[in-house]
């Protein structure tokens, strides 16, 4: 199992516990070190590499499962990204993608802000860029945080965008599940996962507002 943008390695742990060979890739060296230490504390084996995945040619055609969790919304050229990932799938391999819909209350990842006001303010990321940037500076956010939030605003991902990109890059959707309450909220906030109402899930654009996480399983056509 390969995870691109593995962070601290939490998503790979269940697979390691099942006996799978796991490899985590992240461009942040600090995250890779955290992942290594995390697996050591859990007494599990895993390989973690600080690199751009597309520089690791020796991993091509190797993985039956690739995880892309909370990463696609940070990628500017999503078409090139998904197309290039085909090189790393083994025959009949699949890719799991999860992301917060852009128009949901915290789809801009503003919870990373230092200011308690900004980090708890829903929908602020939907403001025009210049106004959003101005408010972030008024609340004395660090310039690095401001730039990260503005980059996410530029590279945002919606349900409609993901579906279109999947089709354009030669994949098909095997399974789609939209969540009103993100399954990860159970660990973070003690909230039980809750799927989005089917009627709302079929309303374009409106469904983005209520989808705190969107799960997709895709494979090449």
Locations of the language-model features?
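Conserved SAM-binding loop
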Residues: 1-107, 215-220
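S-adenosyl-L-methionine-dependent methyltransferase catalytic module, highlighting the catalytic core
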Residues: 79-84, 94-216
């Amino acid at each position: 199992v390969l995870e691109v943008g593995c962070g601290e390695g939490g998503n790979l742990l269940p697979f390691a516990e099942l006996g799978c060979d796991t490899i985590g890739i992240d461009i942040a060296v600090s995250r890779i070190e955290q992942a290594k230490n995390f697996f050591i504390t859990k007494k599990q084996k895993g390989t973690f590499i600080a690199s751009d995945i597309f520089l690791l040619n020796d991993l091509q055609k190797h993985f039956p499962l690739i995880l892309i969790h909370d990463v696609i919304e940070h990628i500017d050229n999503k078409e090139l990204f998904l197309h290039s990932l085909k090189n790393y799938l083994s025959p009949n391999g699949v890719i799991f993608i999860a992301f917060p819909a852009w128009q949901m209350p915290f789809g801009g990842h503003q919870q990373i802000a230092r200011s308690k006001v900004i980090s708890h303010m829903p929908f602020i990321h939907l403001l025009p860029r210049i106004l959003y940037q101005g408010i972030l500076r008024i609340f004395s956010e660090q310039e690095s945080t401001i730039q990260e939030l503005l980059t996410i605003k530029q590279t945002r991902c919606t349900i409609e965008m993901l579906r279109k990109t999947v089709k354009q890059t030669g994949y098909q959707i095997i399974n789609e599940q939209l969540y009103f309450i993100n399954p990860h909220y159970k660990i973070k906030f003690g909230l039980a996962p809750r799927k989005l109402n089917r009627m709302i899930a079929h309303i374009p654009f409106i469904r983005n507002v209520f989808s705190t996480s969107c799960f997709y399983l895709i494979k090449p056509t």
